Amino acid sequence: MTWFIDRRLNGKNKSTVNRQRFLRRYKAQIKQSISEAINKRSVTDVDSGESVSIPTDDISEPMFHQGRGGLRHRVHPGNDHFIQNDRIERPQGGGGGGSGSGQGQASQDGEGQDEFVFQISKDEYLDLLFEDLALPNLKKNQHRQLNEYKTHRAGFTSNGVPANISVVRSLQNSLARRTAMTAGKRRELHALETELETISHSEPAQLLEEERLRREIAELRTKIERVPFIDTFDLRYKNYEKRPEPSSQAVMFCLMDVSGSMDQATKDMAKRFYILLYLFLSRTYKNVEVVYIRHHTQAKEVDEHEFFYSQETGGTIVSSALKLMDEVVKERYDPGQWNIYAAQASDGDNWADDSPLCHEILAKKLLPVVRYYSYIEITRRAHQTLWREYEHLQATFDNFAMQHIRDQEDIYPVFRELFQKQSANQSA
C-alpha cells in the first residue's frame, strides 16, 4: 500500500488561495461595506469579524451569449403558445425583485438575486480596516541603530551544541523515523504471527511449516530491533538568532476631555475613536507606547481601563492636559530618541481665558518636539475659542491637523483622513 503525506501549507484550508484572490479582487466593495458596518458596532465590539455584503452586479462574470437583436427562425418542441412568424416580446428587466437590495417597489413579476454575503475573519477585517494607514513623519533615530541586537527563538536546527538540544522534538523525530522504517516489517510480522497461530491449531500438525514461520518471525524481530532508538538524524536543537532592535521608537499620547459638557454620546464617540487608534497602533507597530491622559479642570495620567471606563468628570481646563503631557515628555521621552505623537479629543468647550494658553503651550513646547499632533472636535454646535486658536496653529505648523466630527458616521472617515499613509514625495 502506498502512503501519501499532505505537506501543503494549506492542507486543511485548500480554498485559502481562492479566498485571498477574491478579497484582492473585490477589495473596494469590501472596504466600503466595512466602513459602513463599523458605525453600527458597539464600542467594545470594534475588532471582531464581520459579515460583508457585495451587490450581485459587482461580482457578475462576463459571458458570451446570443444577442437579442436580428431575426431568427427556430423550432422549440413542446410550444403551445406561438406559431411560425409570431413575434416574441423582449423580457422586461428591472421588475420588483431584481436586485434584492430592498430599495425598489413591490412588483408581481421580475426575478433577481440577493446580495452576496460572506464572513471575513478578525485578521482580515483589521487588515482591511487599517490598510494604507501609517503614523505620519515616523523617522528612524540613527543612534539607536548602533550595536543593539536582541536574541530571538527561531525554530529548530539539525546542528547545534548539546546545551541547546530539544529532547521532545528529538524524540518525536526518533519515533517518526522508527515508525516509518519498520512499518512494512511490522505488517509482515503481524501477518506471519496470524498464520502461525492458525497452523498451530490445525490438524494434523505441520511441524516444518511452523518451524519456517517461527524462523522468519525471529528474523523480522531482529531486523526491527536493529533500527536504532536514536540517530543523529533525529537530533534537533533550539535555534536562536540575533535581530537588530527596531530603530524607530514611538509614543502616542491620548488626551480625552471628560468634563461635564461632554455628554455620554460625545464620550462614546471619543472612546470609539481612541479604540480605533489603539487597534491601529497595536496591529501595525510592535513597539509603540501609549500614554493615556484624562482631563477636566485637572489632568491625570491613567491606565487603559480607567481611561475608557472611569466616570470622573468636572469643569473644563484643556491646558491642564497639555501641561501634563509636556511634563511626561520631559521626564520619560527624549525627542531625540522617540517619535512623539498626540491625539486630542474634545467637544471644544473650554474656559475662554484658557484657550490662548493652550495655543501658547502647543506652539512653544509641544509642536516643536512632536512628529504629529491631531485634534478632533466632537460637537454639533458652532466652534468656540479653542477651535479658532487651533486654526492658527494649523496654518503655522505642518505637523498639526484638526478634524470635526458631528455624528458617529464621521469617525472612521476622519480617522483615515488623519492617519492616511503619506507618499514618498509628501514624506520627503
From Swiss-Prot:
<dbReference type="Pfam" id="PF04285">
    <property type="entry name" value="DUF444"/>
</dbReference>
<protein>
    <recommendedName>
        <fullName>UPF0229 protein YeaH</fullName>
    </recommendedName>
</protein>
<feature type="compositionally biased region" description="Basic and acidic residues">
    <location>
        <begin position="78"/>
        <end position="90"/>
    </location>
</feature>
<comment type="similarity">
    <text>Belongs to the UPF0229 family.</text>
</comment>
<feature type="compositionally biased region" description="Gly residues">
    <location>
        <begin position="92"/>
        <end position="103"/>
    </location>
</feature>
<dbReference type="InterPro" id="IPR006698">
    <property type="entry name" value="UPF0229"/>
</dbReference>
<feature type="region of interest" description="Disordered">
    <location>
        <begin position="78"/>
        <end position="111"/>
    </location>
</feature>
